[in-house]
C-alpha cells in the first residue's frame, strides 16, 4: 500500500496545477526523477496516476515507486513536447523510453554560409546558415559518404578562409581534377555555387533530377565547344549513375520515404530506419533504445519520432510504421509543421510492398539488437574479469574460473557439481559431476573439502593447468574447508573465494568478515552467473540420481517383478529414461508383462515423475 501521507501530499500539490499544458516529473523516495510526461491539462493527467487499481502495467509499477511530484507549465502542448524531450535527456528517467546513447551522432555539413563552401563532418549543429545532413548512426558510413562526395564533386577540401588576399599555389587535388581551385581564384562564385547546389541535391536524395540537370549542362557545354567542362560533367554523371545502379529500387513512385522497424527484448530495443530516396533504398540507420520494459510500440515510436525527426535537417515525405504503433501523433505532426514549414505523412500499411519493407526493417532491427547485446555481453565479460583481478587482488586475469556447489535431497543422495567459465562464458567440456558417498546427514563443508581435493589432485596427476580462480558456493565454513584441501596438496597459492547466498557477499580465505561489492557491477553479475550455473547443473544431476534410485526401487517393490522381468524391461527399452516415458501399451509388449502388471508399472512411474528436488 502506498503511504497515505505521501498520497495526501501529492494530492495537495495537484490542486495547484490547474488545466495548464506542460510537463510533469514523478520522483522516487530518493528524489530521483523516474518518469517525465507531457499533458494538455496537467491536473487531470497527473491525477490519473494515483488510482492504485491501474490496469496499465507501467502505471502500476510507477505507482509503487512514486513519492513526489514536480511540474513545469508551458504555453502550448507543442512546447510541452519539446520540453519533455529535453527533460528526458537531462534526467534519464527509468520509466521513459529513450535513446540509449547520449553521444552526439555526426552530421555532414555543407558550409553554405561561406562564399566558397566545403563539406565536412561535425557533431555540432549550429544555427549559422550552414546546411546539415544526418544524423549518421554509423561513423564509417558518414566518412564513406564524405569520401564519395569528394570523389564525385570537385569541391575544396582545405580549411581556408576564402577568398584569400593573394592566390595560393595549386594543390595536388587541383592537378588531379578533384578541386576547382577557389584558393587560386580560378573559379567564379556563380560556377562554384552551381557545384554546391549539385552536392545539396545529391545529399537530399534528388539524384535522378540532378543527373537530368547535369546531362542538360553537359549538352549545353558541348554545343558551346566547352569540351573540357563537358568531359568533367560526363564523369560526374557516370559516377552518380554507378552509385544509383548499386541501390535497390523499392518504390516506383520515386518518393522519399522512411520505413521504421522495431525489435525489443525486455528493457532493451532497437529501431531501424530504411531510407528510401528517389524510390531507391539508399541506406539504413539503427538507434538503440532503453526503458522498454513497461512500454508498448506506440509509446516507443512516439518518443523516437519526437527525438529523431525534430532534430533532422531533411524530412522524408512519408514515414511508414508497423500497425502496432498506431496512435495519436497530432502534437508531433504540429511540431514538425511549425519547425519545417511542411509536414510528413505517417502510414501504417497492413499488406503489400510497404508491409514487406516493414518486415525487412524489423528483421534488420532484430539483427542490429542481437549484435549490440552480444557486443555488450562481450564487453561486460572483459570488464568483469578485469574487475575480479583488481578487486580480489588476483595475480593474473581470471580467464578460467571454476565454481563448486553441493546438492542433496534432505541429506540423501548428495552430489557435487563443478562448472567452468572461460573468458567469462560457460565452457561445457569443463563441467564435472561428483557423487558423494559415506556421508550421514547434511555435511556441505566436508563434501566441498572432498570435491576440491579430488578435482585438484586430478589436475595435478593429468598435468593440466590449474584454474585462475575457484569460487565456492557458500560462506566462511565451506570456503575454509576448500582452502584446507588445496593447502594439503602443497600447490602454492590458488586464488579462491566464497560467495554467500544471503547477501551476495564475498569471503576470502583466512578472513572472518565478508566484503560487499556493487551488486550491479559486471564482476558480481559474472560471479552470480557462475554460482547459478553450478547450482542448476548440480540440481539437474541430483534429480537424475533420485529418479534412477526411485525407478529401481519401483521395479523392485512391484509384486511379480523379479530380477528376470526387471532385466527384460530395461533391456527392451535400452535406457531407463525410455522406461519412464513408456505408455501402458508399450509396457505390455515386454515379454512376461501383461495388462495388469503394465498398469501397475505405469502408475508407479507417473508418481515418480511428480518428484521435484528442493
UniProtKB/Swiss-Prot annotation:
PROSITE patterns: GIY_YIG, UVR, UVRC. It comes from the Bacteria. GO terms for biological process: nucleotide-excision repair; SOS response. Residues 19-97 form the GIY-YIG domain. Pfam families: GIY-YIG, UVR, UvrC_RNaseH, UvrC_RNaseH_dom. GO terms for molecular function: DNA binding; excinuclease ABC activity. Residues 208-243 form the UVR domain. Its main location: cytoplasm. InterPro entries: GIY-YIG_endonuc, GIY-YIG_endonuc_sf, GIY-YIG_UvrC_Cho, Hlx-hairpin-Hlx_DNA-bd_motif, RuvA_2-like, UVR_dom, UVR_dom_sf, UvrABC_protein_C. HAMAP family: UvrC (MF_00203). Belongs to the UvrC family. This is UvrABC system protein C.
Amino acid at each position: 500500500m502506498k503511504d497515505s501521507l505521501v498520497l495526501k501530499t501529492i494530492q495537495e500539490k495537484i490542486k495547484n496545477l490547474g488545466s495548464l499544458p506542460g510537463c510533469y516529473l514523478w520522483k522516487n523516495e530518493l528524489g530521483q526523477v523516474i518518469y517525465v510526461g507531457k499533458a494538455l491539462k496537467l491536473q487531470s493527467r497527473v491525477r490519473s496516476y494515483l488510482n492504485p487499481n491501474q490496469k496499465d502495467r507501467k502505471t502500476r509499477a510507477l505507482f509503487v515507486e512514486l513519492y513526489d511530484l514536480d511540474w513545469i507549465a508551458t504555453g502550448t502542448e507543442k512546447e510541452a513536447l519539446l520540453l519533455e524531450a529535453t527533460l528526458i535527456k537531462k534526467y534519464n528517467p527509468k520509466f521513459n523510453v529513450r535513446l540509449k546513447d547520449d553521444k552526439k551522432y555526426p552530421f555532414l555539413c555543407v558550409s553554405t554560409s561561406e562564399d566558397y563552401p566545403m563539406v565536412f563532418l561535425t557533431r555540432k549543429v549550429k544555427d549559422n546558415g550552414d546546411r546539415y545532413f544526418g544524423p549518421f548512426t554509423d561513423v564509417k558510413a558518414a566518412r564513406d559518404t564524405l569520401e564519395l562526395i569528394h570523389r564525385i564533386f570537385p569541391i575544396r577540401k582545405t580549411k581556408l578562409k576564402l577568398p584569400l588576399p593573394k592566390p595560393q599555389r595549386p594543390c595536388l587535388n587541383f592537378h588531379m581534377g578533384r578541386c576547382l581551385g577557389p584558393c587560386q581564384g580560378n573559379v567564379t562564385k556563380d560556377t562554384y555555387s552551381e557545384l554546391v547546389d549539385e552536392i545539396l541535391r545529391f545529399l537530399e536524395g534528388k539524384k535522378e533530377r540532378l543527373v537530368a540537370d547535369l546531362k542538360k549542362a553537359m549538352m549545353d557545354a558541348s554545343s558551346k565547344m566547352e569540351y573540357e567542362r563537358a568531359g568533367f560533367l560526363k564523369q560526374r554523371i557516370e559516377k552518380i549513375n554507378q552509385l544509383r545502379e548499386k541501390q535497390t529500387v523499392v518504390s516506383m513512385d520515386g518518393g522519399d520515404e522512411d520505413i521504421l522497424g522495431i525489435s525489443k527484448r525486455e528493457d532493451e530495443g532497437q529501431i531501424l530506419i530504411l531510407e528510401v530516396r528517389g524510390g531507391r533504398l539508399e541506406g539504413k540507420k539503427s538507434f538503440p533504445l532503453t526503458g522498454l520494459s513497461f512500454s508498448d510500440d506506440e509509446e516507443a515510436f512516439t518518443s523516437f519520432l519526437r527525438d529523431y525527426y525534430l532534430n533532422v535537417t531533411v524530412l522524408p515525405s512519408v514515414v511508414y510504421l508497423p500497425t502496432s504503433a498506431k496512435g495519436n501523433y497530432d502534437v508531433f505532426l504540429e511540431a514538425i509543421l511549425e519547425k519545417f514549414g511542411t509536414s510528413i505523412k505517417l502510414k501504417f500499411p497492413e499488406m503489400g510492398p510497404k508491409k514487406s519493407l516493414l518486415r525487412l526493417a524489423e528483421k534488420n532491427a532484430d539483427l542490429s539488437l542481437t549484435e549490440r547485446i552480444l557486443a555488450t555481453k562481450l564487453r561486460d565479460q572483459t570488464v568483469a574479469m578485469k574487475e575480479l583481478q583488481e578487486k580480489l587482488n588476483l595475480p593474473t586475469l581470471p580467464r578460467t574460473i571454476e565454481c563448486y556447489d553441493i546438492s542433496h535431497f534432505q541429506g540423501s543422495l548428495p552430489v557435487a557439481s563443478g562448472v567452468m567459465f572461460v573468458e567469462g562464458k560457460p565452457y561445457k567440456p569443463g563441467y564435472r559431476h561428483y557423487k558423494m558417498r559415506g556421508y550421514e546427514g547434511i555435511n556441505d563443508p566436508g563434501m566441498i573439502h572432498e570435491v576440491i581435493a579430488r578435482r585438484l589432485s586430478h589436475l595435478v596427476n593429468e598435468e593440466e593447468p590449474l584454474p585462475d580462480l575457484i569460487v565456492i558456493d557458500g560462506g566462511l565454513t565451506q570456503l575454509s574447508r576448500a582452502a584446507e584441501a588445496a593447502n594439503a596438496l602443497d600447490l602454492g597459492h590458488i586464488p579462491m573465494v566464497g560467495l554467500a547466498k544471503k547477501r551476495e557477499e564475498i569471503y576470502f580465505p583466512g578472513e572472518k568478515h565478508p566484503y560487499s561489492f556493487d551488486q550491479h557491477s559486471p564482476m558480481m553479475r559474472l560471479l552470480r552467473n557462475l554460482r547459478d550455473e553450478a547450482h542448476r547443473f548440480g540440481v539437474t544431476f541430483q534429480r537424475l540420481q533420485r529418479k534412477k534410485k526411485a525407478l529401481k526401487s519401483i521395479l523392485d517393490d512391484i509384486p511379480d517383478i523379479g530380477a528376470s522381468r526387471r532385466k527384460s524391461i530395461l533391456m527392451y527399452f535400452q535406457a531407463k529414461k525410455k522406461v519412464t516415458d513408456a505408455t501402458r501399451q508399450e509396457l505390455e509388449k515386454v515379454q512376461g508383462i501383461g495388462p495388469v502388471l503394465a498398469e501397475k508399472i505405469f502408475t508407479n512411474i507417473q508418481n515418480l515423475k511428480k518428484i521435484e528436488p528442493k
